[in-house]
Amino acid sequence: MAGACVFSLKLFESPDALLRSALINDSKQLSAESRESQFTVLESLQAEGLIDFAVAFGSVAEICERNILGATRLAMQRAIEQLAQQADGWSLPQVAAADPLFKAASEVKVIVDGRPLKSFPYAHEGVIKGDGKSLSIAMASIAAKVTRDREMLRLAEKYPVYGFAQHMGYGTAAHRAALIKHCLLYTSD
């Protein structure tokens, strides 16, 4: 109900990266403290050149205009484009409109948590409950959650009456009540 974040990850083949990421799990299964700790591991792996990742947001205005899935697709596309700019020589082939939504596993360049996305310009494969099945998706879920939570804590300081520090903008009863009480229906922050 407040904010959106998507994360994209490129994992380089590295036994060290895999070993050091052994505690990474679905972000929903980790405490906030554990997520922060694992995000620090991801940042270290990136600094050492073992993985590369990008975080991108879908804005409140984009959610209102396109719905949450449309804004998420847009943020995913932005993250992929950021990765392409960061990594020399790395790119994803775009899918023509007539192509199927996803390619054979050997050709897949992007995996997403959930079902394959309609109207997404990159070859991809959906993995249901992927954050519990794929290290890359689990890493992505941690980075997305940590980044989003940090943004919500920033907004909590700016708008304390909404209780973002407690519910992080998710649709809890307390969040809905604060929205109704304080009449905040839309902001572009």
What are these model-derived regions, one by one?
Residues 1-188:
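RNase H-like, Mg2+-dependent phosphodiesterase core
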